[in-house]
């Protein structure tokens, strides 16, 4: 059976009080609508249509070709929004999932179960529900005395007894696609808001003797719709708890989960320890037995086994096995550290390959460079890679010793097994097995200050 999905992402989100459109606000480092789309895809949907309106181009830029798009010029309610997908789906067979783009906590497992329940019961519509102590703001699930679904009533249209009901509609539905688009033509806007409500499709199906089901999720957090900054922070907290719990259940020690922020695409090996205040995002892979010290930040990087990261920032880089970074080091994009490499305190590395066993222990800048195996870069040494217009490369061979406070003026090559005296400014290539000195000779004038 064909499976389709419609993601509702046309709203501006005025309660956010933001220049950014609502569904593009991030949770765990990713726009809410992207979380939704990823989970819809994993649920086994063949085709996705995203309804866009406010911020249409920004939403399309975010989701790219992972979705088809339909434009809703005026936001006249959820049924009106779904109707906009007519051009792509009206003649299709199968099941259509409708999900809101501001529900970043929904999981693909729940969506999958909803679809399977809908199809196995041969229903025309199935609504995803949940129960909560505080149902304010949500549509209520109205059942008859036999527990059979009768209708969904919106908060603003509910009477006092209906508002007391704790089971609420998530706003997520599975429909028989043909029935959905047939009934959308019959929906009217005679309600308190003057809008076309998607739950009215359910009422029309029931009125004509169709079959409607409810699938209830036990985790209310999954269906949280984010409408303001407070709810955004609640969604962030809930998703971080879920992510951190997953990693801890799979062998990772997180000393203080409440202050640790890990993205959804991060992979972490067993027996890795993460101290408080750490942020790990993007497509980062951390292997086994890694120690990540407090307040470190790692993005889109690979950290190999037994590495030790202390209070450092790492972006788009690779750290080899048994390497040590920090404290207070920065690896900028393109940094590649081999095994047993040490990058110490207040060292900045950018677009550089530092080979196995090399050391850059303190107060240095290594940019656009290649540092050979077991080479030692002394304190305060820098690669001078920029002339104001272009970047140039520095190559240092293996087993070299670069004295403290050395300036390597690129482009320059330092051979294997060389020694550069402290305080030198190197402008020419150095052959291997050489000693290089490039500094003024010291002159002492005794008694000068007694004059």
From Swiss-Prot:
Chief subcellular location: cytoplasm
Q: Pfam families from the xrefs?
A: Hexapep (PF00132), NTP_transferase (PF00483)
Q: Which GO terms describe its cellular component?
A: cytoplasm; membrane
Cofactor(s) for this UniProt protein = Mg(2+)
Among InterPro entries, the record links this protein to: Bifunctional_GlmU, GlmU-like, GlmU_C_LbH, Hexapep, Hexapep_transf_CS, NTP_transferase_dom, Nucleotide-diphossugar_trans, Trimer_LpxA-like_sf
The highest taxon in the source lineage is Bacteria
Key words of the record: Acyltransferase, Cell shape, Cell wall biogenesis/degradation, Cytoplasm, Magnesium, Metal-binding, Multifunctional enzyme, Nucleotidyltransferase, Peptidoglycan synthesis, Repeat, Transferase
Q: Which residues of the sequence carry a binding annotation for UDP-N-acetyl-alpha-D-glucosamine?
A: 8-11, 22, 72, 77-78, 139, 154, 227, 332, 350, 365, 376
The catalytic activity of this protein is classed by the Enzyme Commission as 2.7.7.23, 2.3.1.157
What are the GO BP annotations of this UniProt entry? cell morphogenesis; cell wall organization; lipid A biosynthetic process; peptidoglycan biosynthetic process; regulation of cell shape; UDP-N-acetylglucosamine biosynthetic process
Q: How is the cofactor bound?
A: Binds 1 Mg(2+) ion per subunit.
The protein's annotated catalytic reaction(s) are:
alpha-D-glucosamine 1-phosphate + acetyl-CoA = N-acetyl-alpha-D-glucosamine 1-phosphate + CoA + H(+); N-acetyl-alpha-D-glucosamine 1-phosphate + UTP + H(+) = UDP-N-acetyl-alpha-D-glucosamine + diphosphate
Which residues hold acetyl-CoA? 385-386, 422, 439
Q: Which NCBIfam families match?
A: glmU, PRK14354.1
| Oligomer and partners | Homotrimer.
* Protein name per Swiss-Prot or TrEMBL: Bifunctional protein GlmU
Q: What organism does this protein naturally occur in?
A: Staphylococcus epidermidis
